[in-house]
Regions:
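An aromatic/glycine/proline-enriched structural segment found at the starts
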Residues: 1-41
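Short, exposed beta-strand-loop hairpins at the edges of beta-sheets
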Residues: 180-182
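M16 family metallopeptidases and their MPP-like homologs
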Residues: 32-43, 66-170, 187-195
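Active/ligand-binding-proximal structured segments within catalytic/core domains
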Residues: 36, 45-58
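Periplasmic-binding protein-like
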Residues: 61-64
């Protein structure tokens, strides 16, 4: 059995926001980079359902911003879990004139309404596509060593990666709806604009 986690490198404290944060950094560049997100405390056991929720949100938000509106090409929109926190965020680069169009949309994009009417088939398709990519990444010996090593280092459990993927396989539509209702409301959002 692994010893208790006492590695100074991975012990961390998190920013505790009690008010929204807005940072606007003038840079004079030809591109503007935007980050918007919010942090939620989460319950143990919700990690896999939050991953599935993040994957679904990513597909829907990126389709809206990139394909329907044509306002960004390279972007990220998802949730990231670390310890007992989840960061729901959108990050992208765009033309400077698009920043004022996009910023007001972020809260409504990263919300329950974006999910719309999901089916169990939608959830399973999204999870299976992700699992397929993850299995492909783990084919080579060097990548297997990487995932075992990072699981041991960051989680103090060498098989954490495999256990997480197994938990993700078991996520259902009910789980996704439950965590969406529980966590998907922006409070004290962080907005960062680098122009």
């Amino acid at each position: 059995k692994s010893p208790a986690k006492t590695y100074p490198l991975t012990d961390k404290s998190y920013l505790k926001l009690d008010t929204p944060v807005y940072v606007d950094v003038p840079g004079g560049g030809e591109r503007t980079y935007l980050f918007w997100g919010f942090v939620k405390n989460i319950d143990r056991g919700d990690e896999a359902a939050l991953k599935a929720l993040g994957l679904i949100l990513s597909d829907k938000i990126i389709f809206d911003v990139r394909e329907k509106q044509g306002l960004a090409y390279r972007m990220t929109a998802t949730s990231a879990v670390r310890d007992d926190k989840a960061l729901f965020y959108i990050s992208l680069g765009t033309r400077p004139q698009n920043a004022e169009v996009l910023l007001p949309q972020f809260e409504s994009l990263m919300s329950r309404q974006t999910l719309g009417e999901l089916s169990e088939e939608d959830v399973q398709k999204t999870i299976n596509m992700y699992l397929g990519r993850m299995m492909f990444r783990r084919l080579s010996s060097i990548n297997q060593a990487y995932y075992l090593g990072t699981s041991l280092f960051f989680e103090n459990e060498m098989n954490h990666d495999k256990a997480f993927l197994d938990a993700l396989k078991a996520v259902t539509l009910e789980d996704v709806n439950r965590v969406a209702d529980k966590y998907l409301s922006a409070e004290n959002a962080i907005s960062i604009v680098v122009r």
